[in-house]
Amino acid sequence: MSSWKDSLTSIPGTVAQLINESASNLLHASSTLGSTVGLGGSGSTGSGSEAGGSEESGPQGAEYRALPIPASLVREQWRLIFTSDANIQDLQAAIAHCRDLVLLSEELSEERRWLVRHLVDLRYSLQELEEAQEQHSLSSDMVVMNAIRAVVGHHFVPHHPHHGKRNRLQAAAKRNYCDHCTTIIWSVVQNSYVCSDCGFLVHQKCIDGVKRVCAHVLVSERQHPISEICPEIGLASQGYKCAECGTMLNIKNTWIEPRLCDYSGLYYCPRCNWNDSNFIPARIIHNWDFSPRRVSRTALQEIRLFLNKPLIRLEEDNPKLFVFVEKLCAVKKLRQNLVHMRHYLAACKIASELKLVDQQLGVRRHLAQSNEFYSLSDLSQVESGALSEFLQGVFKAFNDHIRSCPMCLAQAYICEICSNNEVIFPFDDGCIKCDQCNSIFHRVCLTRKNMICPKCIRIQERRLQLDRMKSTEDDDDDDDGVATDDDVTAAE
């Protein structure tokens, strides 16, 4: 039984090998080229043969590892898993079949998760194979060198830290370590690859044994950072094994001691948890605590990918923070003003030509689109005060344009309570906006009216008047259509 399970877990989960080998065949290269990671190995061919012994792939003949295929999909593996002999038609058929299986599988199940990841790999490999056919004019060495290796969601590209004089000096002062074997990467004599999505750095020789799923895949599936503070489940629930590589953990031996990740609440071995420190999103949201805590390597990469994504509804998750944290309250007020300003700038042709919003906000347009969403980087800058300074600079630039632009001034308001000729805007200090009719008044003036908007009163009176007129007309129509007693008597 154990050998049967091992044969299932050894089924690779990527198809980059068939890309490079097919490209080499197209270019009539020698069979010695192609030290690539692929979906070959101990897999099934597209003709329907069952999974057999491991097949050499690369100079070392190493066995490629990936996520184990779910037991319920074993009978479908011959239609999903291919060796390097597969062509574009085989991949297209596998993509169509895998897509159908995704629709038939249950939501949030292990089968659907495996199928979605495998579908991404198939589509990515199909694209690479099509591009390889288009590059038939390139030499085989160039194709193999530029090949992207796909392993458990990672997209590994060659790592070149010595390009440029400045980069060479920086690389000499900084040591890079392999995320798989934890040893130093000597860039002068050793080739290395880096994942273009999550930054996973690895020796070329270690690519075959990578087990960690790409953090970019995990972020795409989870969509939000973990909201619980250190959701620990205990070593017993993990079977006293590392949550990533499955190494048996032992408290007595330091080289295999369990290390707790404060982000995921799981225990890892020293190779998967380097005691890196980082702030924890859940502790920021619930406790406004930015103290660095020890996290695993995969958690560190995941937090970095979440860093600039505006996904946190802070006022919904913890509304009392805006009461106790003055910096947060000030930032909220600035963002509310920027939201009002954006409506003026969106309708201004001059601001559109100047690209004022893009120039001031860049990729952080969410700061002026609403005041609900925050990123981890935003919250960190709120604590340091950098975000408040940034928003004040943006506010000044927007305010200068609106008050000097004739198109924006044409949309200004005048307080109808005090009849002052001074124009006012909803983002001015001392002004307030009616939530019903969007009219702008001086706060002092509206306070004297007991916070009752005069425009809303006029609208309500006009609506009542129209209702009375309509009811009167309906009564007249009824009188014209119904005969009275006098009319009946006269007719007799």
From Swiss-Prot:
Q: Name one Pfam family in it.
A: C1_1
What CDD domains does this protein map onto? Answer: C1_DEF8
**Do you know which SMART domains this protein is assigned to?**
C1 (SM00109), DUF4206 (SM01175)
Bias-annotated ranges (Gly residues): 38-51
Task: Tell me which residue ranges form Phorbol-ester/DAG-type zinc fingers.
Answer: 161-214, 400-453
Q: Which UniProt keywords apply?
A: Metal-binding, Repeat, Zinc, Zinc-finger
Stretches with biased composition (Acidic residues): 473-492
Q: What highest taxon heads this organism's lineage?
A: Eukaryota
The answer to whether UniProt assigns keyword Zinc to this entry is yes
Q: Where is this region: Disordered?
A: 38-62, 468-492
Give GO MF terms, alphabetically.
Answer: zinc ion binding
Family the entry assigns = Belongs to the DEF8 family.
Q: What is this protein called?
A: Differentially expressed in FDCP 8 homolog
The uppermost taxa in this organism's lineage are: Eukaryota, Metazoa, Ecdysozoa, Arthropoda, Hexapoda
